[in-house]
Amino acid sequence: MGGAMEAGAVERITIVGAGLVGASIALALRRAQPGCRIVAVDPDPAVREALVPGIADEATDDLAAGLRDAQLVFVACPVGAMPAVLEAVARLAPADCLVTDCGSTKASVAVAAAEAFGVDSPRFVAGHPIAGSEGSGPAAARADLFDGRIWLLCPAGPAQEKAAARLAELLSRLGARVESIHPAAHDAMFAEFSHWPHAVAFALCAA
């Protein structure tokens, strides 16, 4: 990586997928770094209309245009779309741009990222902000959505660990508590969590 992700130097940020999480990232960035330029990429015209003004400086459905001159990219699209989106972002984004995702599963994203960017590429760090809301879409977005919430980064190797350290500085300014975990360990942990509601329900029925 070049100097694009040095602390305080990120001025041009692109968010791919501007639902609740993507739009909240934009608002948190505006709060933390008022001078940065935020471009949102989303295929839904209603979403794009809701973003400008106020949330993003520009909203487009053209990925190539949205990635032009970006220093940092947040990919906040559905996990199922991640392989195709990461492949396109890897091809179209500037070579010194850092890319991270916001998906809830990480092992499959790590595989897709390795195919798109290369194994342990310093251009990509998998991520998972543990934050949500009852609402959805940009109308429910909040600048404080990540305040005090854990944001997991999942570097897959030494090069990504260095990139993750730089990214963590920015995420901390968004209010998040940043922790690192291996992609496979992340998925194993959340798979275990997913069993808990079923176990509780079973126990209640058996009581």
Model-predicted segments: where are they?
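Conserved short alpha-helix immediately C-terminal to the canonical SAM/SAH-binding motif I
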Residues: 45-47, 81, 106-109
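Rossmann-like NAD(P)-binding element
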Residues: 63-93, 97-100
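Residues at the starts of beta-strands that form the adenosine-phosphate
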Residues: 12, 37, 123, 150, ...
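NAD(P)+-binding Rossmann beta1-loop-alpha1 motif at the extreme N-terminus of oxidoreductases
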Residues: 2-62, 68
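Rossmann-like NAD(P)(H) cofactor-binding subdomain of soluble oxidoreductases
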Residues: 85-139
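Short secondary-structure boundary/capping segments
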Residues: 5, 64, 91, 116, ...
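Internal alpha-helical scaffold of NAD(P)-dependent oxidoreductase catalytic cores
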Residues: 145-207
